[in-house]
A protein has these predicted regions:
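Outer-membrane beta-barrel translocator/receptor signature
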Residues: 226, 242-244, 255-334, 340-344, ...
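Acidic/polar loop-and-plug regions of large Gram-negative outer-membrane beta-barrel proteins
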Residues: 316-320, 333-402, 415-449, 493-524, ...
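Structural signature of Gram-negative outer-membrane beta-barrels, strongest in the C-terminal barrel
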Residues: 337-341, 449, 468-472, 476-480, ...
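C-terminal beta-signal and adjacent terminal beta-strands/loops
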Residues: 748-758, 777-825
Length: 825
């Protein structure tokens, strides 16, 4: 297909040029950018385009909308269009113009559109005399103005939420912006079905369906071993400034990477070079001196629009509600997308992030009996010399080639390097009755991690037995190199919890080494690779069967030298581990699809040895899901309800009646088996006109089925995961005389949760609570807007994380506000 660019600025010139071509020619309409135009999914604007040939109407619309569209003139020969009158977004406008022509405008990775035959699908809606295809939104969410998406990419290829037989939530760009979600921790706190738990190292642990999410991260679909270490917990210092969306899958995600946690996975999808010029400036200021500035700019870098760029710079400086802690973030991101041919696009990107912080970590202790000290929420028991420095560099690259209308191949790679230097101390030790002091435990960390990831897959559709099917076949590999030195030592000073001394003298680094209770250098290399395939068979018009499998090879070696004496060499290998996936979808009508699915995942445990000296089998996680999904209002609203059951078995457990040559002197056995089950309900998108909503309710019940300690059988596990969790946020754009205003409101609510102390066996409980948040936005004109966000509006006092008597109890944020000013050019 040849590509010709119409003369830039005048629609009449494009019209004359197009009408002059022969029917066999292929064309790209490259329109100029009208004032106020934005990215791939522009905001709604008014059009008055009279009836005429479809080529004429399509050309005029592309020009006025400021988008580029490629097509063969033969596709439009002899077709007419009634025109377009009214206010529409780009996708909606294309859909209405094309009507029942049998064609659709498909958004490409490059940000341009391509005209292709509309697939035969049962989920089309009849609106008057116009047939509109069910998918108006695309996978890209920025500038869509929506809390839902037209497609997800976490499972390879692009499929609607309704076509995906697993639970997936997408945190769109609008949601990120509306709630000022700037870190992965903040994103996960707002995601339905996810529970966030603070670690003593300042990171977060994420839980889904009763289990911890560990190491299941993707960058643009490329799997990495990010966030799976003590120094980071499950989170890491990545800023959300340069991401388009975050896709969160709940349930076993073995097809993503092979090994990992039972509970789910996360895919971060970055912003790309833009097809039309756009710049956004953002400044915000809030409670506790929380200031942030951001510049996001992009557009075509040549006249043809075949080279597109993007640059994002963000800087944030903030204090916290607890004493003296502060943090500064700097983010730099650049991206380039190049159309090597009309069907081949190369994407490149690089990000650099720097964190300079004086944190307050470790949380608060309790009385020895587990009761609350009732300290002020502003209390920090750490010394003022706590430091945390982190630098992260990430390089992205991908190449996508469209072989024809049905088949495409994509190759993508990611490299990331993270260095962290940490020195801190925190309160560690329960407070005795009649006393007010606790110990201080200090730590020194020098941490380096380099990750590589590569993924390549072929995705295509084919016809057989009178139906249309899809095949995905791919390979991927990842490697993680961790070089860590740490030392933990008890400080000689005590801390008074009711009158803390923040100016405790800072010990020299050598003190931590000379007085180390644990620590030393640790080097770990983890490699895994695999092949995977998914086949979507259309057995009948309403019935689709999905079957997939992955074969994985895994290797990990870790070498530790202990400052207290001795070494440890841990090895774990899995060869040809098969991970299956099956699913079935039944379209009940034009809106609803019922589905059932099974997936599993494995976690290697070969570094544990049994009494016979053999390596333990992998821990296995199995997920069963039965549900129904809905797609409404041309895909602008998605609903889902499911029943789930997850079983985790063969967990390594300590045999305290044995003796082995391990670091703790004990042997292990595959003995643990636990189960989590419950149901989820979720709604995302435009519920009524101008109201965007993301809401999810999750009920989770956990049970220990088999434990080496028989007294635990029948009880719950991970009891700090609440049984009931509600996440809700809505944003409503007012109409009439108040059309410049928008209002948002939401709540994070959960039932009680508890921990049984490993020290005293006391039950430490946090009662259920609800935290209400709100937002008011005002659009000054087409360029400027302002917003005021308020969090914890009723100033609820609660612990967001409960720990033990010794440490790990974290207060939730008190009431706070953030004002934001934005300009878009």
């Amino acid at each position: 297909m040849s590509r010709v660019n119409a003369p830039g600025r005048l629609a009449i010139a494009m019209k004359i040029g197009l009408l002059a071509v022969t029917s066999s020619s292929a064309w790209t309409v490259q329109a100029s950018t009208p004032p106020g135009a934005s990215g791939q999914q522009r905001s709604v604007q008014a059009y008055t385009i009279g009836a005429g040939t479809l080529m004429d109407v399509l050309t005029r619309f592309a020009s006025q909308a400021g988008v580029a569209i490629s097509f063969d003139a033969a596709q439009l020969q002899g077709l007419q269009s009634p025109g377009l009158n009214g206010s529409f977004g780009v996708a909606d406008g294309f859909a209405r113009i094309l009507g029942d022509s049998g064609l659709q405008a498909e958004l490409q990775v490059s940000g341009t559109y391509r005209l292709r035959a509309a697939p035969s699908r049962g989920s089309v809606m009849e609106l008057g005399t116009t047939t509109i295809d069910g998918q108006l939104l695309t996978a890209t969410t920025e500038d869509s103005g929506s809390y839902t998406t037209g497609a997800v990419t976490i499972g390879k290829g692009e499929h609607t939420l309704r076509e995906t037989p697993q639970s997936v939530t997408v945190i769109t760009r609008k949601m990120l912006d509306d709630q000022n979600l700037n870190t992965i921790d903040q994103v996960m706190e707002k995601t339905p079905g996810i529970t966030v738990y603070d670690s003593t190292m300042g990171g977060k642990y994420f839980y889904s369906r009763g289990f911890r999410m560990s190491g299941q991260y993707q960058y643009d679909g490329v799997p990495l071993d990010m966030g799976n270490s003590y120094v980071q917990a499950d989170s890491f210092s990545s800023d959300m400034a340069y991401y388009d969306r975050v896709e969160v899958l709940r349930g076993a995600a073995g097809m993503m990477k092979g090994s990992g946690g039972t509970s789910g996975g996360v895919n971060f999808v970055r912003k790309r070079g833009q097809a039309t010029p756009q710049t956004e400036l953002s400044l915000s200021g809030g409670t506790w001196d929380n200031y942030r500035g951001q510049v996001d700019t992009g557009g075509p870098l040549n006249d043809a629009g075949t080279v597109r760029g993007r640059a994002v710079i963000a800087e944030q400086s903030r204090h916290y509600f607890y004493d003296d802690a502060q943090r500064k973030d700097q983010v730099y991101y650049g991206a380039l997308d190049v159309d090597l041919t009309p069907d081949t696009t190369l994407g490149l990107g690089v990000a650099y992030e720097d964190v300079d912080a004086s944190p307050c970590w470790g949380g608060l202790p309790r009385y020895r009996d587990g009761s609350d000290l009732k300290l002020s929420r502003s209390t920090c028991l750490d010394p003022s010399w706590n430091t945390w420095r982190s630098q992260r560099t990430t390089v992205f690259g991908d190449l996508r080639h469209q072989l024809n209308d049905d088949w495409a191949v994509k190759v993508a790679g990611v490299y990331t390097k993270n260095t962290q230097d940490i020195k801190y101390a925190f309160a560690s030790g329960s407070v005795a009755p009649g006393s007010s002091t606790t110990n201080l435990l200090g730590s020194l960390y020098d941490y380096d991690q380099v990750d590589y990831g590569l993924d390549a897959y072929l995705d295509g559709k084919f016809d057989a037995f009178g139906q249309r099917h899809e095949l995905i076949f791919g390979v991927n590999a990842s490697r993680s190199d961790k070089d860590d030195f740490y030392s933990v030592a008890l400080l000689p000073q005590k801390q008074d919890v009711f009158d803390p001394d923040r100016h405790i003298p800072e010990p020299d680094d050598s003190y931590f080494i000379e007085n180390s209770t644990r620590g030393g250098p640790v080097k770990t290399v983890t490699e895994q690779h695999g092949v995977y395939s998914t086949l979507r068979l259309k057995l009948a018009d309403p019935l689709t069967f999905v079957v997939g499998s992955r074969v994985s090879w895994y290797s990990s070696k870790s070498d530790s030298v202990f400052l207290t004496g001795g070494t440890e060499h841990a090895r774990s290998t899995e060869t040809g581990q098969v991970t299956p996936f099956t699913g079935v979808l039944l379209d009940l009508n034009e809106h609803l699809t019922a589905y059932a699915s099974y997936s599993d995942i494995f976690t290697p445990q070969g570094n544990y040895r049994s009494q016979s000296g053999s390596a333990l089998k992998p821990l296995m996680g199995e997920s069963y899901e039965l549900g129904i999904k809905g797609e409404w209002f041309e895909g602008r609203l998605n609903t889902a309800f499911n029943l789930f059951r997850t079983v985790q078995k063969d967990q390594a457990q300590t045999d305290y009646n044995s003796s082995c040559a391990s670091s703790d002197g004990y042997c292990y056995e595959n003995a643990g088996k636990v189960r989590a089950q419950g149901f989820e309900a979720e709604i995302s998108g435009e519920v009524i006109e101008r109201l965007q909503l993301l809401a999810g309710y999750t009920y989770t019940q956990t049970k220990t089925l088999d434990d080496i300690d028989a007294s635990l059988n029948g009880g719950s596990f991970n009891s700090y995961v609440p049984r009931h969790v509600l996440r809700l946020w809505g944003d409503y754009a007012l109409g009439g005389a108040l059309e410049r205003f928008s209002v948002g409101a939401g709540v994070n609510a959960q039932s009680d949760n508890f921990r049984v102390s490993p020290v005293s066996s006391e039950k430490i409980t946090q009662a259920g609570y609800a935290v209400w948040n709100g937002r008011v936005g005002y659009r000054i004109d087409d360029t400027w807007s302002v917003a005021l966000n308020g969090n914890n509006l009723f100033d609820k006092r609660y612990y967001t994380t409960i720990g033990t008597e010794s440490f790990g109890n974290y207060y939730g944020e008190p009431r706070n506000f953030t004002a934001t000013v934005k300009a878009r050019f």
